[in-house]
C-alpha cells in the first residue's frame, strides 16, 4: 500500500503546452518563458515524471532557441520515443481511424468541388485561400494527423501516463483508447496541486 503513494505519476507533454498561446500564457508570454516557469514548478513536483517523445522535442525546437532553455529541462523532462516495435494497439483504433479518414476525404472533396463552382464569382487567390482554410478544417481538425501525434498516443499508452495536450484530435483519440488526459488550461493548477 505504501508503494502506491510513492509511485510517481507519469506525464507526457505535447508542444502545445509551451507553444499554443491559449495554453502557454498560463506559464509565460513566449515559449522560452513558458518553459522556464514550467521548470520552476516541475522541480518541486517530486511525485511526477515528465516525458516528451523525440519527434515532439524536435518540433518544440523549431519554436524555441535551444540556448535559452534552462539546463534543468533535460534533467526534468525525459526525451523518450515509444517502442514502436512492441507497441500494441486495438484493432478498433485502426478501424475507426480509417472510417474517419474516409469521411474526411469525402468532405474535403466536397470543399474542393464548391471552390471550383465559385471560380467565376471570386478571384483565384481568394478561392485558393478559402479552399485551403476549409480543406484544412475538413481533413485535419479533430484527428491524429502527424507522426508526432502517434508518438504521443503510443508513449502515453506504453507508460500508462497522463497526456497533456491542447490538440483536440489527440484528446479525442486518447479518450477512445482510455488514455488519461488533463485539460491543458488546468495543467498549471494540476502541477501546483502536486506540490502542495
Curated annotation (Swiss-Prot):
**GO aspect biological process, one term:** tRNA 5'-leader removal
SUPFAM superfamilies, alphabetized: PIN domain-like
Per UniProt, the keywords (alphabetical) are:
Endonuclease, Hydrolase, Nuclease, tRNA processing
Family annotation (CDD domains): PIN_VapC-like
Please indicate which superkingdom the organism of origin belongs to. Answer: Bacteria
Q: Which reaction does it catalyse?
A: Endonucleolytic cleavage of RNA, removing 5'-extranucleotides from tRNA precursor
Q: Identify the EC number(s).
A: 3.1.26.5
Entry keyword Magnesium: no
Q: What GO molecular function terms would the record report?
A: ribonuclease P activity
Leading EC class: hydrolase
Alphabetical list of NCBIfam families matching this protein: PRK04358.1-5 (NF003344), RNA_lig_partner (TIGR03875)
Q: Which family does it belong to?
A: Belongs to the HARP family.
> Briefly, what is this protein's role?
RNA-free RNase P that catalyzes the removal of the 5'-leader sequence from pre-tRNA to produce the mature 5'-terminus.
Q: What is the protein named?
A: RNA-free ribonuclease P
